[in-house]
């Protein structure tokens, strides 16, 4: 087993009408918790790390952990660079073995976004690395990234078509009403916009900001063509909440083997639910 490109995972998902969950990772415990569930449920998985994650724990260490777990659980997995904005940073990490990258130029005007993404695609494809890009812009907060509501905008279907044609990108993250983080009220998802994008764009579509979105909404986006579902905030909240509760009950506790396991178990329940929502269980052979 090995670290593979997301391209192969998403192509199968697109052909068979399900989505691959992409879970954000932060340390060894979060990687282990996610993969314990994915192994049990035989679900393909994408482990996504933001630039902030790779500042916290070195790429080489994350890559070694993922490679070891891939062998332990006898399953392929994808290690994905989430919301990276630097070409040079992506090049370095691809040379180190990563085979999936998101170059985020969504804050640039269309032409500049195209230019940036095309340059990354040209390099990454020479290394068998798949590339995701974003058109439109999600609001909210994720790690070091913060986008206010006034700066967020939805994806235009015809621009999406042109963007994919001009860049050769392997998958496209679309802005259809979700946001990073949690919601103060139920999000208004533009399903019609998603359907119109699907009609003119052939590559796999990606839903960012899926934390806290009602399950039935996520299922509907998958029916309309989403093949990768990103989850971050819900994982962190479950983990942190369980650890806080453990310390409230065990104020003198100090053994990370106990409180980390409590956090991991809480996170695993979120992972299990998202796999069921995505319909990705039993998609890889035992």
Swiss-Prot record:
Superkingdom to which the source organism belongs: Bacteria
Class of this enzyme: lyase
UniProt xrefs under SUPFAM superfamilies: Aldolase (SSF51569)
Family matches, as Pfam families: F_bP_aldolase (PF01116)
BP terms from Gene Ontology: carbohydrate metabolic process; D-tagatose 6-phosphate catabolic process
Keywords: Lyase, Metal-binding, Zinc
Keyword Lyase appears in the UniProt entry: yes
EC id: 4.1.2.40
Cofactor: Zn(2+)
Protein name (Swiss-Prot/TrEMBL): D-tagatose-1,6-bisphosphate aldolase subunit KbaY
Catalytically driven reaction(s): D-tagatofuranose 1,6-bisphosphate = D-glyceraldehyde 3-phosphate + dihydroxyacetone phosphate
Family: Belongs to the class II fructose-bisphosphate aldolase family. TagBP aldolase KbaY subfamily.
Native organism: Escherichia coli O127:H6 (strain E2348/69 / EPEC)
